[in-house]
Amino acid sequence: MTKLFMKLGVAICVAIVSLPSMADINADLANICTIVKNNDKSELRKKINKVKKEYKVRLSDYYGGITCGGNTLIRHAMSHAANDAGAYLIKQMRKSDLNKPEGDGKTIKQWAEENGHIGGPIGTALLDRLG
């Protein structure tokens, strides 16, 4: 009986200790919109690599869950002419994810064409990546 309580106590401690780390990813990604808006490619690279290393997730795993003023990260970069950050985000995404419709049912390419961003540096990087 004592062993059962001991194992249960250890399991509860492990669960309590691991809970804060799940919430930390949100804190780590809290300022990513500002980083993209400021076109800070170096800081963006650090942020993405930190999240990848600490939480074992890739950009494509959390990309759809982040919105900046109602836009995804790449759309946000296009809207603010954050060319270096936008091109970096495109290089980090899988081609298949770049072709997926986003929340409004449009792909990044369709949205960029409709909003006049396809001819800019980020649009060019997108077209090059999509082949």
What residue spans do the PLM features occupy?
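Conserved hydrophobic residue in the first alpha-helix
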Residues: 32, 73-74, 108-109
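Long, amphipathic, charge-rich alpha-helical segments that form helical bundles/coiled-coils
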Residues: 74-80
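Ankyrin repeat arrays, specifically the small/polar loop and inter-repeat linker segments at the C-terminal end
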Residues: 24-29, 41-68, 80-84, 88-131
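N-terminal signal peptide c-region/cleavage motif recognized by signal peptidases
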Residues: 18-22
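Bacterial N-terminal signal peptides that target proteins for export
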Residues: 1-9
